[in-house]
Amino acid sequence: MKNGNKNNGLFWEVDSGHAWLSVDMADLFRSGAHEDISGYSYVDAIKGVAYLEEDCDAGTYLKAIGWKGPINDFKENYVDGDSWVRNLPRFTA
C-alpha cells in the first residue's frame, strides 16, 4: 500500500472551489477507508482512481493508512474554474 509521500502517486486535483485527493482504488479498499467515504467524493472506474474530497474523506483515508505528515506535501494539479473531477460519478462503496 502507498503510504502518503510525495513520490507515491498521491496528489490533489484542485479547482477554484474545492480539492480532491487522487487515490488508487485498490489502496483505498485495502485500507478499509472505503466504508466511510461520502458521496462528495468521485470515482473513475476506468482508471481505478477515487478522488476524495478534501474536507473529510481525504483525511479519513490518510488516517487509515497511518499518514502523519502535512497534507500539503502532495503535488497539485490546479484547474482555473471547475475541475473535470466534478463530472465523474459520485463515490459509492
Predicted regions and their residues:
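Short N-terminal "domain-start" leader segments
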Residues: 1-27
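Alpha-helical interaction segments
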Residues: 2, 50-51
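Intrinsically disordered, low-complexity boundary segments flanking structured domains
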Residues: 6-10, 36-39, 74-75
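Generic preference for hydrophobic/aromatic residues in regular secondary structure cores
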Residues: 10-12, 21, 41-43, 53, ...
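A short, structured beta-strand/loop element
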Residues: 17-46
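Short, compact, well-ordered microdomains
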Residues: 51-93
